[in-house]
Each structure stands twice: as C-alpha cells, then as structure tokens.
Design a protein with these regions (language model features):
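Short beta-strand scaffold positions
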Residues: 4, 35, 73, 92-95, ...
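Short active-site oxyanion
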Residues: 30-32, 70, 102-106
Length: 129
C-alpha cells in the first residue's frame, strides 16, 4: 500500500502538469493507495483556492477519486458523510469536521450560517456557541 500526499492527488485530478499527472496515474494503477482525511481536506482547499473549483466540482472530483477500486481512505464513513453534507451547501472542511465527531457528541460553532446549514441538512446535535 502507498500513502499519497496532496500534490499527488491534485496532479491526478487536474492533470495540470503532464509529467506528474502521468506519474500519479501510474502510481494509482500500480496498487493499493491510502489517502488520509487531511490529504482530502488539503486537496479540497487547493482545488478551490488555486484551481477555482466550486463545492460541487470538489465533491464530484473526490467522489470519483474515492470510487477507484484500489483507493482506501481514512475513516471512509465520515468522508462519505462529509461529501453528502456538501450537497447542502456546507463546505468540505466544515462537513469533514462535523462528520468526524464521535457518535452522539454535540458539535458547536460560532458560525451561525454553518449551524443553520447543518441543521437544514438534518445534522443533529449541532449548536451555536
């Protein structure tokens, strides 16, 4: 199994550097790949900040990536829940934080808009401080 860094994921998803994209494709084809949640978070940030991806495009790209047969991801259930939450307008980082909390734990934030979006998405135990 090979764990990958954000730049490998971004090269695979964007293909913006032909040589590195080819190397990333070969790596992903060669065997099992492990992706940490932090790599997914940083990939989302890079795709938004440097490549102009919106939340839907980030969700679609990461969903395709995680659908590859040889890709394993840290805390797959939380990542899947986070990607689903982004459909409700919650950004990837907030969705990942919310979906990664222990079962039954409250989640609090000063961000009024986030709390409202989370509640509209059906998340329970979310409150504003």
């Amino acid at each position: 199994m090979t764990a990958v860094d954000t730049n490998v994921v971004v090269r695979l998803l964007t293909g913006d550097d032909a040589k590195q994209a080819a190397a990333a494709r070969a790596l992903f084809a060669a065997g099992p790949i492990w992706i940490a949640k932090t790599v997914l978070l940083e990939s989302g940030w890079v795709l938004r900040s440097l490549y102009g991806f919106d939340t839907g495009a980030i969700r679609d790209a990461l969903t395709r990536l995680l659908g590859l047969k040889n890709v394993r991801v840290e805390d797959a259930a939380a990542v899947a829940a986070a990607l689903t939450l982004t459909q409700s307008g919650i950004d990837l980082a907030d969705a990942m934080h919310l979906s990664s909390r222990p079962v039954g734990a409250r989640f609090v934030s000063f961000d009024k808009a986030f709390v409202a979006r989370a509640k509209r998405a059906g998340a329970s135990g979310v409150a504003r401080v």
